């Protein structure tokens, strides 16, 4: 094979591999195989000076452009009318019903109304133009809707966008360039000027003349409309979406067909529920009539198509005033800042507090007391301050670190980016949180133990170590608030019962940094005893599934602490007896599979179904993804079941699950 033919073969293979990896999430080759072919292609292109216009090597952002050229779209990119209440959707639907009835009265043969519901992505709209050879010729921003700015070099850095498609028609496809949360976090870890939000990250990347900077932001995209196409027109929107998908353009998994307001309302509730679990931002839903002929007849206003509407969710980002900063002590002794905010409505809740990670983060973002700040809420966690409104800095105050621990007055020590209180003997928040963690359900499971109990043990009984729990007597507890003889006896019995525990629960209870329940189980499966784990080397630790360098270093440092070793020795001498029994994996259809259980099951609690699946060799996951093999759905299964249906994952009822066990 000559070099030109080899170049063509490599380009075809590499583009197919990219489609499998980025669009199907199902790679057929390893990264190593891909890289070898990519480097071979680079070398051949250098030797021959022959580069196909859709070669993957053209994605590399290594140019700085002089400016943006204007581009006139072949078909207008319309804005959408917006609704913020269900009543507005109902009014819009009623207008559509009336129009269809009147059109039928004039002799038009229109089908019953059917709506297609999709997510409204919060990024930057882009328009791709492919020529008659299927090659990506122009990429442009929406601009005015009629005229945009050419951003072809920038868009080519988005690896999920095919540089060549199968269509031979001149084609314009509309989509949204987005930045995922994962890409956003990774970029901000190393950026001197952190991005404030995902939308600005995407928009700023495409409007950057330095294409290398665009590539650094690792954008993604979803496509949802063919604005212009020569040849046979589409009959329905669903047919159009199928065409887009067949061209290898990335299409979101979520797309719903609804025939009633009740169905639309259900989809609004569902997407609102999963919104913060997504890896990217959406700000609502788009509801559009499916039938293209009906669309043509309904037409447009001056600004909007009448056949579609956007339902907008509550904002997940807002600006408000930073009133103060409060410093709190965690279980590890880390003293961290929390922002006290002027209350603001954000994604349906009133926000008064937000995360400020550390002083380095505060300095990078330029956050000051009294300034207006951008606050963002995602994934149902405490909101985070993303940056400041520059115009509000006048009269603001610098945030300063307390000189001593706010809880115990001890000297603070800077370790990396964080400040720590090293008073592990009498700093109340550290000790209380350590004891509460030790007693928690997934750890030693001491029933009836609360944070208030831990505070009283510290304040009135001078309990300063988890081992002190096993020295408590009934007369000690009766003197505490709300502790009568019965409650005291129950707590002592629960403490005694905790001595007989599983090894993974004991390891988790010790509070090793970055070791959760799953990691504790993985460590136990490898080392089988507390002694085995104490004596593990770094190489042995990183050899455990899902254990990386940070966790391994944390485990090694933990077991070097003399106080830790003394506490473990004392716990064992007081009768705590962690046990490890290697669970026999029962051969089954679930061995090696990823399974999610959702809803209420008749014969299993959450813990029981998890234990059962693990005994069958399954990996039990908490959320549904493309990597999920089975979803076991009980009564009142919610969004996880819906997502499984979207992704085409095998769904089992409880009866079907048990039938598979009997085979």
Curated annotation (Swiss-Prot):
Pfam families: BRCT, DNA_ligase_aden, DNA_ligase_OB, HHH_2, HHH_5. GO terms for biological process: DNA repair; DNA replication. Keywords: DNA damage, DNA repair, DNA replication, Ligase, Magnesium, Manganese, Metal-binding, NAD, Zinc. Its EC number is 6.5.1.2. The keyword Transport does not apply. DNA ligase that catalyzes the formation of phosphodiester linkages between 5'-phosphoryl and 3'-hydroxyl groups in double-stranded DNA using NAD as a coenzyme and as the energy source for the reaction. It is essential for DNA replication and repair of damaged DNA. This is DNA ligase. It comes from Clostridium beijerinckii (strain ATCC 51743 / NCIMB 8052) (Clostridium acetobutylicum). The gene is ligA.
